[in-house]
């Protein structure tokens, strides 16, 4: 979905007003679902959240992404190592809109569809080309929601859901390149 970085809350506000619909606000760096909000033009706190997330125009970036309705059915966290997908699981929001495990999301083992597998092949090539040897990608096919290259997470969750320990495989793939 469209992802718009900006330091100006006014620019983001105009986009929300003109395009309508739901949008996700989040910081460019962060984890665990902290400071991730859904905003809509008619909500009374949308402008205040935009102002806060951009530090009132004082040079702090905010990311705004079109909300993907299908995420209500869950998103898949896919782990990549050495340019290939190595494991995945599904996360579904339970308490609020955030699919982060620490925020109460429910997890389950899952497979990738043929179309998701093809998309992951292309994502793996992209990640390898960018030098990202280990990453987690959140996706709701056909959308890539987020790339997680600093702290991909998910190894423990996959082990708990499937009994498969991917650590050695990931190390081998990362070191092979």
Where are these regions (language model features)?
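Phosphate-binding site of ATP-dependent enzymes
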Residues: 9-10, 19-24, 28-119, 123, ...
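ATP-dependent carboxylate activation and anion-phosphoryl transfer catalytic cores
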Residues: 94-98, 111-177
């Amino acid at each position: 979905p469209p992802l718009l970085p900006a330091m100006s809350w006014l620019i983001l506000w105009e986009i929300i007003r003109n395009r309508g619909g739901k949008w996700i606000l989040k910081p460019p760096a962060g984890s665990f679902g902290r400071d991730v909000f859904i905003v809509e033009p008619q909500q009374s706190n949308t402008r205040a959240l935009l102002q806060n997330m951009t530090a009132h125009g004082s040079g702090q970036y905010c990311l705004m992404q079109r909300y993907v309705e299908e995420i209500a059915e869950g998103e898949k966290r896919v782990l990549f190592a050495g340019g290939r997908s190595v494991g995945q699981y599904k996360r579904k929001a339970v308490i609020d809109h955030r699919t982060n495990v620490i925020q109460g999301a429910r997890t389950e083992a899952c497979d990738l569809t043929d179309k998701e597998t093809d998309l992951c092949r292309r994502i793996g090539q992209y990640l390898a080309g960018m030098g990202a040897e280990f990453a987690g990608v959140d996706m709701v096919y056909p959308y890539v929601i987020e790339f997680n290259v600093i702290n991909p997470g998910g190894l423990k969750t996959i082990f708990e859901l499937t009994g498969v320990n991917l650590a050695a495989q990931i190390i081998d793939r990362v070191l092979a390149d």
